[in-house]
């Protein structure tokens, strides 16, 4: 059953979240807007909303099959999906498989070095503070999550990393790093939320002699045509997955 938007709950840099007639379901609408460096750089990428919505739908469906609880219910339009209503934790969880981006800048590391085991980092979602890196002790001090929740977030992030790495390899891409967000349901259970797309994953095509960027770094660092890069990721996802996504009834399941 489709759910029409009833009330705008939140508008962020890349998405709008609406209430629906069912209090358990939100409608998530993806935008073409693009930002980088904590919104210091702004623009748009043609077709980004549709790419990110469709890619996220496929990835969330795949992760659900692997036993990762997530908020996705169904894609209801090119740029819209139904999601489980959650209270989003004010944390970003970043998993790094290779050195890249801010990690290299912060620690003076060469880009592209493998990280084994993968590195898990937590960032406080606060635009005014520039989304700072925080430790579990900082999280406890700020009452952002309980120690038990932090431990669960870390273990879930590593599990997602394993399955997500397999998914992107099927698309002939390497998962360099990525960020996740999580939310709590009314019973306090943790669910993977937000999106998983070229906006949130650093993806390198390693088929050539040099890694080729196919993610938001195309926009962030003016490395090429972002719209073309995003469309290529979408086509690879469609080629690598079953296009028939599960229905909301099939997706609605408990944590067990």
From Swiss-Prot:
Taxonomic superkingdom: Bacteria
Pathway assigned in UniProt: Purine metabolism; IMP biosynthesis via de novo pathway; 5-amino-1-(5-phospho-D-ribosyl)imidazole-4-carboxamide from 5-amino-1-(5-phospho-D-ribosyl)imidazole-4-carboxylate: step 1/2
Gene3D superfamilies attached to this UniProt entry: ATP-grasp fold, B domain, Phosphorylase Kinase, domain 1
A Gene Ontology BP annotation from the UniProt entry: cobalamin biosynthetic process
Pfam family, one: SAICAR_synt
Example GO molecular function: ATP binding
Family per similarity comment: Belongs to the SAICAR synthetase family.
Protein name in the entry: Phosphoribosylaminoimidazole-succinocarboxamide synthase
Organism: Synechococcus sp. (strain JA-3-3Ab) (Cyanobacteria bacterium Yellowstone A-Prime)
Classification lineage: Bacteria, Bacillati, Cyanobacteriota, Cyanophyceae, Synechococcales
